[in-house]
């Protein structure tokens, strides 16, 4: 069972028992999901079905999608998700947490744990493309050493924001930053 901890949060494999708290804390919250590529879940069964699909990836030899719970250590409650999309020596990274837990450094800690985990897999380049209006996520990424490569025009659709493709920030963490990050992450 995969589990990595920082001072206040852990990233770990999801469990079916996470469905209710994860729906309540994050996946069912329309505001928390506004910058995702899908709508908020409508009920806990939708969250349970998603968790079952995501858990099936854990046993694959080379999974192309890894969704982990972000757990607050004190309460041992799942408060969000960390999504990794490894592909050979590079990966995408995405994260989100409940609005109730924002502003405490949890997303930054979870992102750093994700970077360290990807390094352990031999990943040397990590990228992500948050919506240009998602200032909190962009700030977390900058704290973790990601560098803006510019704006990706009409890059992705965010259903909560409408049907039109939205502009996103092209953020990357390259090999040099990864080596530096490994020394500075503790």
Language model regions located:
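A short hydrophobic/aromatic micro-motif that marks alpha-helical segments and, especially, helix-coil
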Residues: 43-45, 58, 160
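Residue-level recognition of short, structured coil/turn motifs
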Residues: 37, 63, 120-123
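Helix-loop element at the rim of GNAT/NAT acetyltransferase active sites that forms part
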Residues: 24-39, 59
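Acyl-donor (CoA/ACP) binding surface of acyl/acetyltransferases
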Residues: 1-21, 25-31, 71-186
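A short helix-loop-beta-strand connector motif used in the catalytic cores of GNAT acetyltransferases and
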Residues: 53-69
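Hydrophobic alpha-helical segments with strong N-terminal bias
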Residues: 13, 41, 53-56, 83
